[in-house]
């Protein structure tokens, strides 16, 4: 799209569920829509839901990235940390869609949010979760699996202690304990981490990628 970020997400915007037969008359519908299907936003306002109603829903690149680092020293001790953060980007959970779209059926294990699904007009659910056997809209890429990649992360913490030596054989020694990728605060529910993706350098979709490993390192530096 002209004047839009590269690799932008262009898809249907899911705004609810057709909960009753009256909803099919009240709201714009897609061909073969039925009660219990996902309801999409009529982006162009023509009263019909079709390919022309796909719209720009986000982009993988964050608007801002942040970082803060510092080192504290007290006598022979030192403590350093690195905190990183970002805001304004999105990621598409392909794994979530593969496992969780309508039409997959209710005969196997399903995610917990299906407890609130549409079952009938008498049991319409939460108004956001369609019928699990309603396959009409399950084939489409839509905003239900598009997530924010905003996060704050404790990337690195190192605690060190310098051992004093009076003899000249060893000039200096420092013992340290380092933790990497210790904590992350985010709202991503489509996978393990908003940093994990299968898009390579593009970072636009996640198909169950592993998060960055948490690493604990104990080491010693010695100067002779």
Residue ranges of predicted features:
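C-terminal beta-signal and terminal closure region of outer-membrane beta-barrel proteins
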Residues: 1-22, 106, 113-124, 139, ...
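Conserved small-residue
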Residues: 1-59, 180-182, 187
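Extracytoplasmic gating/loop element in the C-terminal half of outer-membrane beta-barrel translocons
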Residues: 1-11, 21-22, 31-35, 86-174, ...
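Flexible, solvent-exposed coil segments and beta strand-coil junctions
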Residues: 43-51, 130-143, 195-202
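Repeated loop/turn-to-beta-strand initiation elements of outer-membrane beta-barrel proteins
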Residues: 76-81, 166-167
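Membrane-embedded beta-strand positions of outer-membrane beta-barrel proteins
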Residues: 81, 175-177, 220
């Amino acid at each position: 799209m002209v004047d839009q970020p590269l690799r932008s997400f262009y898809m249907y915007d899911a705004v609810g569920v057709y909960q009753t037969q009256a909803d099919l008359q009240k709201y714009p519908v897609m061909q073969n829509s039925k009660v219990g299907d996902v309801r999409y936003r009529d982006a162009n306002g023509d009263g019909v839901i079709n390919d022309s109603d796909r719209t720009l829903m986000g982009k993988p690149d964050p608007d801002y990235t942040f970082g803060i680092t510092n080192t504290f020293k007290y006598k022979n001790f030192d403590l350093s940390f690195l905190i990183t953060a970002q805001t304004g980007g999105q990621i598409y959970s392909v794994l979530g869609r593969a496992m969780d779209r309508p039409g997959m059926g209710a005969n196997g294990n399903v995610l917990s949010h299906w407890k609130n699904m549409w079952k009938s007009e008498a049991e319409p659910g939460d108004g956001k979760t369609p019928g699990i056997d309603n396959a009409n809209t399950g084939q489409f890429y839509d905003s239900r699996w598009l997530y924010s990649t905003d996060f704050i992360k404790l990337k690195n913490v190192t605690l060190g202690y310098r051992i004093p030596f009076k003899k000249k054989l060893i000039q200096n020694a420092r013992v340290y304990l380092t933790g990497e990728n210790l904590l992350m605060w985010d709202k991503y529910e489509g996978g393990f981490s908003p940093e994990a993706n299968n898009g390579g350098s593009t970072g636009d979709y996640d198909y169950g990628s592993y998060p960055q490993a948490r690493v604990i390192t104990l080491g010693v530096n010695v100067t002779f």
